[in-house]
């Protein structure tokens, strides 16, 4: 197996592939965060003991 100079150790991904993967991870984190903020707001609004 020849070493590919474009692959980055230890993942074996190229820089472009790793940047694309990172973009998807960050997008997923933002979506999760937005859902969590909405869920916490709804829990605050509909929980009488939090007022």
From Swiss-Prot:
Domain of life: Bacteria
One Pfam family named in its UniProt record: LHC
Entry keywords, A to Z: Antenna complex, Bacteriochlorophyll, Cell inner membrane, Cell membrane, Chlorophyll, Chromophore, Light-harvesting polypeptide, Magnesium, Membrane, Metal-binding, Transmembrane, Transmembrane helix
Topological relation to the membrane, as annotated: Single-pass type II membrane protein
Family according to the record: Belongs to the antenna complex beta subunit family.
Subunit annotation: The core complex is formed by different alpha and beta chains, binding bacteriochlorophyll molecules, and arranged most probably in tetrameric structures disposed around the reaction center. The non-pigmented gamma chains may constitute additional components.
Protein name, per record: Light-harvesting protein B-800-850 beta chain B
Species of the source: Rhodopseudomonas palustris (strain ATCC BAA-98 / CGA009)
């Amino acid at each position: 197996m020849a070493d590919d100079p474009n692959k980055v150790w230890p993942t074996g991904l190229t820089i472009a592939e790793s940047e694309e993967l990172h973009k998807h991870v960050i997008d997923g984190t933002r979506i999760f965060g937005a859902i969590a903020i909405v869920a916490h707001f709804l829990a605050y609004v509909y929980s009488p003991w939090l007022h």
